[in-house]
């Protein structure tokens, strides 16, 4: 059963995780968010009921 031989795919998996953790992740974490969270209280809108013309 060739899938039990970890020789070809284990190295590829380790290298792909190393690239993700060392190169891609710091670049993604350095981005700033455009909308920072605020402490405003959440207000629920009070919608007016729709008047249907055919009722």
UniProtKB/Swiss-Prot annotation:
Record key words, sorted: ATP synthesis, CF(0), Hydrogen ion transport, Ion transport, Membrane, Mitochondrion, Transmembrane, Transmembrane helix, Transport
Major place of residence: mitochondrion
Residue ranges of the TM segments: 9-29
GO cellular component entries: mitochondrial membrane; proton-transporting ATP synthase complex
Keyword Transmembrane helix annotated: yes
Annotated GO biological process: proton motive force-driven ATP synthesis
Subcellular location: Mitochondrion membrane
Superkingdom of origin organism: Eukaryota
Database matches in PANTHER family: ATP SYNTHASE PROTEIN 8
Job description of the protein: Subunit 8, of the mitochondrial membrane ATP synthase complex (F(1)F(0) ATP synthase or Complex V) that produces ATP from ADP in the presence of a proton gradient across the membrane which is generated by electron transport complexes of the respiratory chain. ATP synthase complex consist of a soluble F(1) head domain - the catalytic core - and a membrane F(1) domain - the membrane proton channel. These two domains are linked by a central stalk rotating inside the F(1) region and a stationary peripheral stalk.
Complex formation: Component of the ATP synthase complex composed at least of ATP5F1A/subunit alpha, ATP5F1B/subunit beta, ATP5MC1/subunit c (homooctomer), MT-ATP6/subunit a, MT-ATP8/subunit 8, ATP5ME/subunit e, ATP5MF/subunit f, ATP5MG/subunit g, ATP5MK/subunit k, ATP5MJ/subunit j, ATP5F1C/subunit gamma, ATP5F1D/subunit delta, ATP5F1E/subunit epsilon, ATP5PF/subunit F6, ATP5PB/subunit b, ATP5PD/subunit d, ATP5PO/subunit OSCP.
Protein family per UniProt: Belongs to the ATPase protein 8 family.
Protein's UniProt name: ATP synthase F(0) complex subunit 8
Source species: Rhea americana (Greater rhea)
Lineage, highest ranks first: Eukaryota, Metazoa, Chordata, Craniata, Vertebrata
